[in-house]
Swiss-Prot record:
Function: Carrier of the growing fatty acid chain in fatty acid biosynthesis.
Family: Belongs to the acyl carrier protein (ACP) family.
One example GO MF annotation: acyl carrier activity
PTM comment: 4'-phosphopantetheine is transferred from CoA to a specific serine of apo-ACP by AcpS. This modification is essential for activity because fatty acids are bound in thioester linkage to the sulfhydryl of the prosthetic group.
Alphabetical keyword list: Cytoplasm, Fatty acid biosynthesis, Fatty acid metabolism, Lipid biosynthesis, Lipid metabolism, Phosphopantetheine, Phosphoprotein
Pathway listed: Lipid metabolism; fatty acid biosynthesis
Highest taxon listed in the record's lineage: Bacteria
Source species: Geobacter metallireducens (strain ATCC 53774 / DSM 7210 / GS-15)
Residue ranges of domain Carrier in the record: 2-77
Record SUPFAM superfamilies: ACP-like (SSF47336)
Recorded GO CC terms: cytosol; membrane
Protein name: Acyl carrier protein
Amino acid sequence: MSAIDKRVKEIVAEQLGVDEAQVTNEASFMDDLGADSLDTVELVMALEEEFDIEISDEDAEKIQSVQDAIDYITEHT
């Protein structure tokens, strides 16, 4: 597991209040981890802050799972 993978999973678990064991690469924020639209906005903001990147609204809508977030951050850092 890369440092990005590990940190994304930690942030997701912290932001959504779920156990890190539930945060698998395939996990959907809404369907599997119980996030609502506000949670996903806050999650994107936390990822932007942690990785010092800006995620456009258009791109944020495409980030639906843990793997989507990891892929996006890997490509943009």
